[in-house]
Amino acid sequence: MSNTTTARLLSAALLLSVSAAQAQDALLTKAKAYVVSATAPVTKCNGPTTGPKAAAGKSVIYISGDGNNGGITGVAAGVKEAAGVIGWTYRQIDGRGTVAGHSTAMGQAIALKPSAIVVGGFDAAEQADLITQADKAGIVVVAWHAGPQSGPIATPKIFTNVTTPIESTATAAAYYAIANSDGKAGVVVFTDSTARIAMAKANAMADIIKTCKTCTLLEIRNQAIAGAIPAMPQVTSSLLQKYGNKWNYSLAINDIYFDGMVPALSAAGIKPTGQLINISAGDGSISAYQRIRDGQYQDATIPEPLNLQGWQLVDEINRALAGQKPSNYSIPVHLVTKANINADGGDKNLFDPQNNYRAEYRKIWGK
């Protein structure tokens, strides 16, 4: 090989190296800017400002996918509160975290002939036949976390599905890991393959971590949410043996994984802060807020505005009853860390934006 050819190859390699470094610097800058935006106070109400006045004498049944899940019960509280304001009767049925339980709850709700049913936290495809039965009976069906995307679901027919876009949630969690580690995160992603929204969120987080050339995606670990707390000690011990110090960041689709992980981390001598950074891309449970506030094995969570989403579900039902289209409202993603944990309802261990959303919905409904 001639000296000229060698020089050209070295020059090309150098250019590639410089280009890769520039791309990595750009990613870090973007990630850090995104984190700043996602942790900012939420003071502006960017939801709907017009809509139909309140329909009179209506009833709504909230089917809780699992009465032990903090996110599901938080939305239920919002639906109940908003139903009281708009003047409707409210009832809740617990699906008890199983497919059979969801089926039983759906059947009971349909038999009661309410004006509307809220599918609260389980996949619409799982109960397609019963949702279709409700629609044919003239019952409005809306949902929270019944599919991977917000907005109407065509099959089975759901007027609208309320959820924070998974792309936004995944981006906030993954970018926090990239920014906080300065591009050196070794990541395990925890998800539940039984739910489409969980898998979509996990895959989106994994794809973003892969764009960080100096980060490492160690594994996407499947563990059902329903059995996460008793299973996670053994799962955690196994992962620590497998990866050791290479595992320094966790991205989970729900805080509940960290509820079960803490005992194993403590027993293994893992420091509560700085050694294994745990980030949840969803839920914002009370225990997660407490861990973040106390610096105990969790750095961040991405809570949804559960009470606000409950109010939105009631508003969406009211739009459906009036023959109008869904509002297609979705609040921007919000990242909670120790630095901002006491803002926007965080002092009460929840994300409740201080943007007067209750007053805005009352104005729309004439209440």
Q: Can you annotate each of these PLM segments?
A:
Residues 18, 23-367:
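A residue-level marker of the well-folded mature domains of exported/periplasmic proteins
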Residues 1-23:
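Gram-negative bacterial Sec-dependent N-terminal signal peptides
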